[in-house]
C-alpha cells in the first residue's frame, strides 16, 4: 500500500504536467482535431520545393537527391533528402509524431522545457510554470503560423540538449553524456543550423561559467574530464547526422552562404552573406520593449489602423474613407514582421525575481547569454557589435535574420524565473529578503510598464516624423495625379500629411498604453501571488497553480492576436490547385522546359514548382552563381538568359487578373550545339559576356575549362550540316539525350552545372563535362549518332552513411546503458539489502 502511494506521489506531478500541456495545446489548436488545417506560408512553399522529389520517391522508391523544380535545378540537401542511417531521428525522433501538428509543437516544447528543468533540479510542480512560459511565448505562434517547421522542432529539442550539458558538467557525467549525445543528435537532425548555433553559444557560456568555478574551487581535473565527455557527446551527435552535415557543408560552399565569386552583390560577398543582407531583419533597440509590452511597436506589419480610430477620423474629413485600414500601425525598422517576440510580462517579472534571489553561479551565465543574444538580435542597430561577431564568431556570417537570436532569450527568461521559484519552493529565502526582492522585481518591471502607460509619449514619437513624411509624399502624388495644383500651391499636402502623421502616432501610442496597463496588471497578479506566499497566506502548491494561471492569462490572449480558431481552413481549401494557365502548360509534353511565373514574386515563391520546372523558386541558400544570374539578368527578364534556361512559357496576369500562359518560341531547347567558344578570364567577365554574346551560337567558358575545348573548332561545313540533340527522358537525377552530329561538336545543356555528384556518359562510358554560360553544363561530343546520359548521386554516400550509422548505434547503446544503470540504482535505493 505504501509502495503504491509512493509511486502515485512520484508520478502525480508528471501526469499533471503532461495533462496541462496537452489540454493547453489541444484547446488552442482544437480545429486540427476536426480535420481542419492551419495554412502556413512556408509549408505551402516547401510542398512546391519538394514536389518533384516526393513524386519520384513515391513512384520509384528512389531518392533523387536533386530537384529540377526550382532555380533551374539544385541539390536537395537543404530541401528533402532521405538519410536512412539517421536512426536516432528515425526511432527516438518519432515520439513527436504521437500528436499531430500544430498542437504537437506546443505540447512537446512545454514538455521538453519541463524535462530540462527536472535535470536542472527544479521540482516537477514548479517546472510547469516556466514550461508554460516557454511553450506559450508568442514567437512560437508566429513561426508556427509562418510554417517554419524545422525551426520549431529545433526549439523543441534545444532545452533537452541544454539539460544534457548541465547534467554532464554538474551531475552524473556518464548519464549526462548519454543524454547530451541523444538530444543533440535530435537537435542537429531537426535541420535548423542557426537555432542550434545560438544554443551552442548558450552552452559555451555555461561551460565558461563552470570552468571559472572549477578554477576557483581547484577541481579543474574533474572539469576537464567532464568537458571531454561533453565533447565526445557532441562528436557522436554530429556523427549521427554526419551525412546531412557533410553534404550541407560541402554544398554550402556553392551557395549564397559560401559567398559569390564576383565582387559583392546585393545579397552575397566573397566570404558569405553581406552584412546588409544578413542584418536586414534586425530587432530595433527600442522595439525590444515589446518583449514586455506586446503592442509597443504597433504589433505586426499587416496591422492597420482602426476604422473608427483617430487616423480614420482625420482621413474621413478629407473624404478618404477606408484609407486608415491601408496604413501600417507597425512603426519599427524591420522590413516585415509577423509580430512581437513577447515573452510575457509575468515571465519577465519572475526572471527579475530570479536575478534578485538565485545564487550567482546559477544565474550570471544565464543573464550574460541573454544580454549577448539581445545585442546580436539588434544587428544593424548596433553595427559595431555585429561586425565584431561577424569577424570573431566562426560561421556566424552564414546566417541571416539576426533577430532570431532572441530565441535564446525566450528560453533563458523562464529559466531565471524557475530558479527563483525553486528557492521559494524550498523555503530557502527569509521572509524579509523575499519581500525586498519582490518589491525590487515588481518595481523594475511594473514601474517601467507604469511609466510607459502614463508618459510613453514623452519618450517616443511613435513614428510621427516618418509617417508625416510618408503621408505628405502620398498626398503630393495624389494631387499631382488628379491635377489638383491649387491644393499643392496652398500646401495642403504638407498640412494633411502632418495631421495624418500626428493621428497615426497618437493611435500607436494608445495601442502601446493599453498593453502597458495590461502588462502591469499581469505583473501585479504574479507579484501578488508571491506576496501572499511570502506572508504565508497560501502554500507553495496554490502559488504554483496561481502563477500557471497567470502565465496562461498573460500569454494566450496575445497569442490569439496572431493565430486563432478562425485561421483554420478545410483540408480541401489548403490544397494547391492548378490554374487554367498551369493546365495549358502541362498539356505541352515537350520534356525539360521551364516556366517563369510573373504573377507571383518569382524568386520568393515555390508554388510554380508544384506543377512546372521553374526559373524561380523559394530558398534562403540558392546556388551562388544562380543568385548572380538573378541579380544581373533574370530580375530584368533578359531574353537571352531566359532562352538559355529553356524558358518556354511565361505566366503573366491576363484579363481580369487571371494567370495566362504565354509561349516563348525563342527558347534554346533542352540542349543545343554551338559553333564557337568565348573564353572568359574571370567570373566577372563570364557573367558580363552573357549579355554581349549570341548564346545560341557561342558558349562562354572559364579560362580553367579551356582544355576541354582545346583544338576544337567548328568548320563552316560542320555548322551548316544538320545537327540534332534532344532530351528523350527526364527525371530529377537522370537525363537522357539522343544526338546526331557529322563531326565532333560542343553541346550546351540547359541544366545547372554542379561540381559534385553529376556524372556524364556517352553510350554508357563516362565522359568529361565542364561549365558553360556561367551556370550551365557542356560537353565535347564525338561525331555520329550517340546517347548522352547524366546521372546524379551524392559523392561518398556509402562512407557518409556508414559514419552516420555507427555513431547513431553508439548513441542508442549509450542511452540504453544509462537507462539500465538508472533502473539498477533505483532498485538499490528501494531495496538496500539486495
Pin down the residues of each PLM region.
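Extracytoplasmic
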Residues: 260-264, 555-720, 736, 742
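Transmembrane signal-anchor helices characteristic of membrane glycosylation enzymes that use polyprenol
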Residues: 13-49, 234-247, 372-375, 448-457, ...
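Membrane-interface coil-to-helix junctions
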Residues: 22-113, 120, 132-155, 269-345, ...
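Membrane-interface segments at or immediately adjacent to transmembrane helices
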Residues: 48-52, 250-292, 470-502, 550, ...
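Contiguous transmembrane helix-bundle modules in multi-pass membrane proteins
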Residues: 3, 131, 147-157, 168-185, ...
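Active-site-proximal, structured, solvent-exposed surfaces of multi-pass membrane proteins
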Residues: 349, 375, 648, 657, ...
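Hydrophobic alpha-helical transmembrane segments
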Residues: 99-113, 338-354, 409-418, 518-527
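Transmembrane-helix signature of polytopic, membrane-embedded enzymes
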Residues: 117-136, 171-177
Amino acid at each position: 500500500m505504501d509502495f503504491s502511494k509512493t509511486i502515485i506521489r512520484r508520478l502525480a506531478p508528471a501526469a499533471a504536467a503532461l495533462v496541462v500541456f496537452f489540454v493547453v495545446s489541444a484547446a488552442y489548436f482544437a480545429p486540427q482535431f476536426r480535420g481542419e488545417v492551419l495554412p502556413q506560408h512556408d509549408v505551402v512553399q516547401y510542398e512546391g520545393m519538394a514536389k518533384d522529389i516526393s513524386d519520384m520517391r513515391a513512384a520509384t522508391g528512389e531518392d533523387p537527391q536533386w530537384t529540377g523544380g526550382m532555380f533551374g535545378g539544385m541539390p536537395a540537401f537543404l530541401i528533402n533528402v532521405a538519410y536512412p542511417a539517421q536512426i536516432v531521428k528515425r526511432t527516438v525522433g518519432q515520439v513527436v509524431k504521437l500528436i499531430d501538428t500544430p498542437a504537437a509543437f506546443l505540447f512537446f516544447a512545454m514538455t521538453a522545457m519541463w524535462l530540462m528543468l527536472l535535470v536542472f533540479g527544479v521540482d516537477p510542480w514548479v517546472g510547469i510554470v516556466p514550461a508554460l512560459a516557454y511553450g506559450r511565448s508568442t514567437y512560437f505562434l508566429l513561426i508556427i503560423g509562418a510554417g517554419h517547421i524545422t525551426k520549431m522542432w529545433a526549439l523543441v529539442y534545444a532545452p533537452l540538449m541544454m539539460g544534457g550539458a548541465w547534467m554532464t558538467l554538474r551531475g552524473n557525467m556518464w548519464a549526462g553524456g548519454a543524454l547530451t549525445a541523444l538530444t543533440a543528435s535530435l537537435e542537429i537532425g531537426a535541420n535548423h543550423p542557426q537555432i542550434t548555433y545560438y544554443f551552442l553559444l548558450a552552452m559555451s557560456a555555461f561551460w565558461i561559467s563552470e570552468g571559472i568555478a572549477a578554477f576557483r574551487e581547484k577541481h579543474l581535473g574533474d572539469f576537464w574530464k567532464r568537458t571531454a565527455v561533453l565533447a565526445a557527446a557532441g562528436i557522436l551527435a554530429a556523427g549521427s547526422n554526419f551525412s546531412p552535415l557533410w553534404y550541407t557543408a560541402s554544398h554550402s560552399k556553392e551557395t549564397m552562404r559560401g559567398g559569390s565569386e564576383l565582387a559583392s552583390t546585393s545579397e552575397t560577398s566573397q566570404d558569405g552573406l553581406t552584412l546588409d543582407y544578413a542584418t536586414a531583419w534586425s530587432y530595433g533597440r527600442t522595439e525590444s520593449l515589446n518583449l514586455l509590452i506586446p503592442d509597443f511597436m504597433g504589433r505586426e506589419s499587416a496591422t492597420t489602423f482602426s476604422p473608427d480610430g483617430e487616423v480614420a477620423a482625420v482621413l474621413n474629413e478629407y473624404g478618404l474613407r477606408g484609407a486608415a485600414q491601408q496604413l501600417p500601425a507597425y512603426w519599427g525598422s524591420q522590413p516585415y514582421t509577423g509580430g512581437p517576440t513577447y515573452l510575457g510580462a509575468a515571465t519577465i517579472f519572475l526572471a527579475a525575481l530570479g536575478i534578485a534571489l538565485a545564487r550567482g553561479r546559477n544565474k550570471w551565465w544565464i543573464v550574460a547569454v541573454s544580454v549577448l543574444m539581445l545585442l546580436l538580435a539588434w544587428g544593424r542597430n548596433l553595427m559595431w557589435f555585429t561586425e565584431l561577431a561577424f569577424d570573431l564568431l566562426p560561421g556566424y556570417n552564414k546566417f541571416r535574420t539576426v533577430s532570431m537570436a532572441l530565441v535564446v532569450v525566450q528560453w533563458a527568461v523562464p529559466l531565471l524565473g524557475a530558479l527563483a521559484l525553486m528557492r521559494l519552493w524550498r523555503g530557502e529565502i527569509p521572509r524579509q529578503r523575499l519581500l525586498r526582492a519582490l518589491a525590487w522585481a515588481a518595481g523594475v518591471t511594473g514601474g517601467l510598464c507604469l511609466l510607459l502607460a502614463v508618459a510613453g509619449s514623452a519618450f517616443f514619437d511613435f513614428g510621427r516624423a516618418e509617417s508625416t513624411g510618408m503621408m505628405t509624399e502620398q498626398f503630393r502624388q495624389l494631387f499631382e495625379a488628379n491635377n489638383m495644383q491649387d491644393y499643392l500651391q496652398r500646401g495642403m499636402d504638407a498640412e494633411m500629411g502632418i495631421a495624418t502623421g500626428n493621428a497615426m502616432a497618437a493611435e500607436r501610442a494608445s495601442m502601446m498604453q493599453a498593453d502597458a496597463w495590461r502588462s502591469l496588471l499581469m505583473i501585479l497578479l504574479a507579484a501578488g501571488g508571491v506576496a501572499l506566499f511570502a506572508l504565508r497566506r497560501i502554500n507553495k502548491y496554490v502559488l504554483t497553480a496561481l502563477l500557471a494561471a497567470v502565465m496562461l492569462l498573460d500569454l494566450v490572449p496575445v497569442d490569439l492576436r496572431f493565430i486563432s480558431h478562425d485561421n483554420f481552413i478545410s483540408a480541401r481549401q489548403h490544397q494547391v490547385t492548378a490554374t487554367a494557365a498551369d493546365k495549358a502548360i502541362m498539356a505541352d509534353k515537350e520534356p525539360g522546359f521551364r516556366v517563369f511565373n510573373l504573377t507571383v514574386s518569382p524568386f520568393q515563391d515555390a508554388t510554380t514548382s508544384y506543377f512546372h520546372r521553374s526559373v524561380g523558386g523559394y530558398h534562403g541558400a540558392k546556388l551562388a552563381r544562380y543568385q548572380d544570374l538573378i541579380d544581373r539578368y533574370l530580375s530584368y527578364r533578359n531574353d537571352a538568359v531566359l532562352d538559355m534556361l529553356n524558358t518556354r512559357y511565361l505566366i503573366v496576369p491576363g484579363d481580369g487578373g487571371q494567370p495566362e500562359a504565354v509561349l516563348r518560341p525563342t527558347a534554346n531547347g533542352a540542349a543545343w550545339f554551338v559553333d564557337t567558344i568565348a573564353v572568359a578570364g574571370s567570373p566577372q567577365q563570364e557573367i558580363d559576356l552573357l549579355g554581349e554574346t549570341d548564346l545560341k551560337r557561342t558558349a562562354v567558358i572559364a579560362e580553367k575549362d579551356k582544355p576541354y575545348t582545346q583544338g576544337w573548332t567548328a568548320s563552316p561545313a560542320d555548322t551548316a550540316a544538320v545537327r540534332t540533340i534532344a532530351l528523350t527522358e527526364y527525371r530529377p537525377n537522370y537525363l537522357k539525350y539522343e544526338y546526331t552530329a557529322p563531326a565532333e561538336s560542343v553541346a550546351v545543356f540547359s541544366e545547372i552545372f554542379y561540381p559534385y555528384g553529376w556524372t556524364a556518359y556517352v553510350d554508357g562510358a563516362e565522359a568529361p563535362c565542364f561549365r558553360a554560360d556561367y551556370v550551365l553544363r557542356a560537353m565535347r561530343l564525338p561525331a555520329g549518332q550517340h546517347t548522352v546520359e547524366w546521372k546524379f548521386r551524392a559523392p561518398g554516400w556509402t562512407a557518409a552513411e556508414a559514419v552516420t550509422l555507427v555513431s547513431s548505434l553508439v548513441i542508442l547503446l549509450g542511452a540504453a546503458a544509462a537507462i539500465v544503470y538508472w533502473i539498477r540504482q533505483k532498485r538499490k535505493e528501494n531495496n538496500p539489502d539486495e
